[in-house]
Amino acid sequence: MARSVPPADTSATPLSPPSKPVALQALSTNTLGAWAGGSFSTGDLIGNIQRAQMGLVGLRYHRLLIPSPSKTETGGPTLTYTVDMFPVLLLSIPPNTVAPPPARKEPGPEESSVYQEGMDAYGFGVGPAGLRLTSRVAKRVQPFVGGSTGLSYFSQPIPNGLGRHLNFMFGVGAGVQIVLTSDLILTAGYRYYHLSNGFRGQINPGIDANLLHLGVAMSQ
């Protein structure tokens, strides 16, 4: 006599939702980071002082604007607002790069020393208005483009006594951010920086810097 087989349990076992990629886990509304950069050459799009060198250390806050973290399952582009604090700004101008004062004007000590000897200045600044557009946010390697603008204050007038301590600065650039863990992100990129007093001084030659930067960020 055949043994009866108990009916199979047809109740469906709920499946656990697939886990998000690490890159999406790292995507957060708020992110804090630190970065540093240095120039490898000067440009001449706007600024006129050549062979100047610029270095900086920055602290950055990121605020995700579009879309929210819950709506990025497809890995589409995101728009982020950034704020930078620069506790360290370094600027070096070599000799014979700032045009001397007109022959009819007697140069002051600060003007002549910069023209003959160059100058090194130290300062700090803030970049309260920045935007970054990042793509492929579901991947570990994510390209981005961005820009920011702000103010800087130096230990002496830039580029000499005819300039100003307070200067405007803005930069645009591109790079990649690499998601190392769900909490840690590495960034590397290039930025074109411009620094000038906005025609508030007696002279305003301006400085353009091609800058490479490296940083880390922590998701909150």
What are these regions (language model features)?
Residues 46-48, 91-119, 156-162, 200-203:
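Flexible, solvent-exposed loop segments that connect beta-strands
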Residues 36-42, 63, 85-91, 149-157, ...:
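Transmembrane beta-strands of outer-membrane beta-barrel pores
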Residues 34, 38, 57-63, 126-135, ...:
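Residues on the lipid-exposed face of transmembrane beta-strands in outer-membrane beta-barrel proteins
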Residues 1-24:
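Cleavable N-terminal export/targeting peptides
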Residues 30-34, 77-85, 143-149, 168-170, ...:
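Transmembrane beta-strands of outer-membrane beta-barrel proteins
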